[in-house]
Curated annotation (Swiss-Prot):
The gene is rpsP. Keywords: Ribonucleoprotein, Ribosomal protein. Pfam families: Ribosomal_S16. The keyword Oxidoreductase does not apply. SUPFAM superfamilies: Ribosomal protein S16. This is Small ribosomal subunit protein bS16. Belongs to the bacterial ribosomal protein bS16 family. It comes from Photorhabdus laumondii subsp. laumondii (strain DSM 15139 / CIP 105565 / TT01) (Photorhabdus luminescens subsp. laumondii). One of its GO terms (cellular component) is cytoplasm. GO terms for molecular function: structural constituent of ribosome. GO terms for biological process: translation. InterPro entries: Ribosomal_bS16, Ribosomal_bS16_CS, Ribosomal_bS16_dom_sf.
Amino acid sequence: MVTIRLARGGAKKRPFYQVVVTDSRSPRDGRFIERVGFFNPIATGKAEALRLDLDRIEHWIGLGATVSDRVSTLIKDAKKVA
C-alpha cells in the first residue's frame, strides 16, 4: 500500500521533515517513491515552514494512496494559505 507521510531529517533537537510518497512497509526514513514537499516545525523569521506540491499529492490520492494524520493536517493548512 502506498502512503504519504513524513520522513525525519535534520540534526538532533532540530527536526526537519520531508513529505514523501512511500510504500507503507518501508522504514520511516528509508526508501521513498517521490518527495512532494517539506515541513520545518521550527522555522523562524522569513524561513519557509511548509511547502507542498498539492497537484502531485492529489494525483497520488487519486491513485489510492493513504495520507497520515499529520500530513492531512499539513495539507489543510497549505490549502488555507493558497
